Amino acid sequence: MTEEACRTRSQKRALERDPTEDDVESKKIKMERGLLASDLNTDGDMRVTPEPGAGPTQGLLRATEATAMAMGRGEGLVGDGPVDMRTSHSDMKSERRPPSPDVIVLSDNEQPSSPRVNGLTTVALKETSTEALMKSSPEERERMIKQLKEELRLEEAKLVLLKKLRQSQIQKEATAQKPTGSVGSTVTTPPPLVRGTQNIPAGKPSLQTSSARMPGSVIPPPLVRGGQQASSKLGPQASSQVVMPPLVRGAQQIHSIRQHSSTGPPPLLLAPRASVPSVQIQGQRIIQQGLIRVANVPNTSLLVNIPQPTPASLKGTTATSAQANSTPTSVASVVTSAESPASRQAAAKLALRKQLEKTLLEIPPPKPPAPEMNFLPSAANNEFIYLVGLEEVVQNLLETQGRMSAATVLSREPYMCAQCKTDFTCRWREEKSGAIMCENCMTTNQKKALKVEHTSRLKAAFVKALQQEQEIEQRLLQQGTAPAQAKAEPTAAPHPVLKQVIKPRRKLAFRSGEARDWSNGAVLQASSQLSRGSATTPRGVLHTFSPSPKLQNSASATALVSRTGRHSERTVSAGKGSATSNWKKTPLSTGGTLAFVSPSLAVHKSSSAVDRQREYLLDMIPPRSIPQSATWK
């Protein structure tokens, strides 16, 4: 076509359709979004495409004057017909180039190439499907793979940016919430709780008012936490009242507690949070396992929770405790000499249990293997960038020079995990047997092997301790059967008593009978001096054979005290003569009941070794949150 035909055609179009400003703006938006192809089908416009070397403005000026006048108004170029906008973003740069004398005119029926989206054409995006990839030739396949790699890199970059944005938003929210939380945490704590390393001074008004109450009142205990020092000193006017002790938690020291009343029970012991040394409070050795009160003070009236005592009952209990203190030492020596088998058995089992716990602590827990990745891939890491560049160079060399080798590598079958049958993992592992496994299966197998090894070591330690404990029981039973038969011949009355003491109690029976034992012991102590002596002397015996500062079988110790309390009740009904002979028998019976794994072998010989081992393993689990008395049978 000539320049005159172009000129006449453009003048015709300018006369037929004078575009408004809105049309111009909408056309601009459509062209920028790549939606111009649909308009071209309906309009049938002539498309004028400048040569790549020539700017669109100067080429059209040379082509036609009417187009130049329309461009002076800012309407003609867009209004006449759409122009290929592939160079529309670089108009300023293209104006500096020398103008081209040629104008390339395309026909109306020709479809324009689709605009670029992110550097890629939409047509190419449609072609990269799985079927097209399988049907295409190797060259096209490589081109598609490169294209997909570029897309993947772009998506990964977007993902990293989104993660960074989310992380920064979360950090801003956390910093905004911190001051509000600090304002809310300044609530005043209730006055009975004492926190931190604080001292309770002697002149506090709360303590003064509590010490000035009636003589028969009971002072509730303050709750002490942390490494505190409760240095409260009670006045002399509190000499006739029962002072409840403070709750002791953790490794605390309670200094200078002056309890002028002789009937105050020892401090309550909450379960310790760690291994805690025993607290010494004026000669009281306290066994710190669970909520159990045990102390070797003989005047604690069998550690009964006293409900609001009257002054008369207080005087009676102080008198009885004074009389119990004045018992002759010969009786205590006789009882301790008779208790030697039980004391030896308890001491041996204590040592065995401590040794087992020591060996269990020495066995390390299973640890997962350390990750083998030496560095994290990051664009900020120079070594990683070097590796990326090296990989690109090697890949290009393989593609350009080693065509055949690359084809053989591509045709190889992918790996598949022998365990989970997956074909994708970050790293393939080959076992010694030749099986190929994925990273996930390999790590789970390693963890399972470590767990099995750990449990086998624990079982070996338990079985060894069980054998030693059985040997100790058999030796003590062989030693104790002969003197038991010799002493059981003169009297026939105490045999049912012995059977009832030897009979094992389960957990619920022990708990339900415990309160009755304590109350019966208190009534007997106030009524008869003989029962006082029999009830208080085993407490001394208990602490002669358990001098350990970290005594851990406190439940068996309380069981011994409760059984002696029941035994004393029967001795009062039987008479003085049978009571003295029964007290000679009790060392053997209580020795039989102190079995810390299972009940006495004399009663449960029919139980199989498997049941004994199961009970033993259940009992030897170190108690974390439950009280110690709940795990003992």
Swiss-Prot record:
Region (Interaction with ZMYND8): 181-295
Organism: Homo sapiens (Human)
Cross-link (Glycyl lysine isopeptide (Lys-Gly) (interchain with G-Cter in SUMO2)): K93, K178, K204, K233, K464, K487, K550, K585, K605
Recorded consequence of changing K149R: Disruption of MBD2-binding, loss of enhancement of MBD2-mediated repression and loss of speckled nuclear localization
The protein, known as: Transcriptional repressor p66-alpha
Chain segments carrying region CR2: 340-480
UniProt modified residues of type Asymmetric dimethylarginine: R539
UniProt KW keywords: Chromosome, Coiled coil, Isopeptide bond, Metal-binding, Methylation, Nucleus, Phosphoprotein, Repressor, Transcription, Transcription regulation, Ubl conjugation, Zinc, Zinc-finger
Biased composition regions of type Polar residues, renumbered to the chain: 108-119, 172-188, 196-212, 228-238
Modified residues (Phosphoserine): S100, S107, S113, S114, S137, S275, S340, S343, S512, S546, S548, S556, S598
Region described as CR1: 144-178
ZnF start-end (GATA-type): 411-464
Modified residues (Omega-N-methylarginine): R225, R249, R258, R273, R285, R539
Subunit structure: Homooligomer. Component of the nucleosome remodeling and deacetylase (NuRD) repressor complex, composed of core proteins MTA1, MTA2, MTA3, RBBP4, RBBP7, HDAC1, HDAC2, MBD2, MBD3, and peripherally associated proteins CDK2AP1, CDK2AP2, GATAD2A, GATAD2B, CHD3, CHD4 and CHD5. The exact stoichiometry of the NuRD complex is unknown, and some subunits such as MBD2 and MBD3, GATAD2A and GATAD2B, and CHD3, CHD4 and CHD5 define mutually exclusive NuRD complexes. Component of the MeCP1 histone deacetylase complex. Interacts with CDK2AP1. Interacts with CHD4. Interacts with ERCC6. Interacts with HDAC1.
Task performed by this protein: Transcriptional repressor. Acts as a component of the histone deacetylase NuRD complex which participates in the remodeling of chromatin. Enhances MBD2-mediated repression. Efficient repression requires the presence of GATAD2B.
Subcellular localization: Nucleus speckle; Nucleus; Chromosome
GO molecular function annotation: protein-macromolecule adaptor activity; sequence-specific DNA binding; zinc ion binding
Domain comment (free text): Both CR1 and CR2 regions are required for speckled nuclear localization.
Region (Disordered): 1-59, 73-119, 172-238, 561-585
InterPro entries, alphabetized: P66 (IPR040386), P66_CC (IPR032346), Znf_GATA (IPR000679)
GO CC annotations, alphabetized: nuclear speck; nucleoplasm; nucleus; NuRD complex
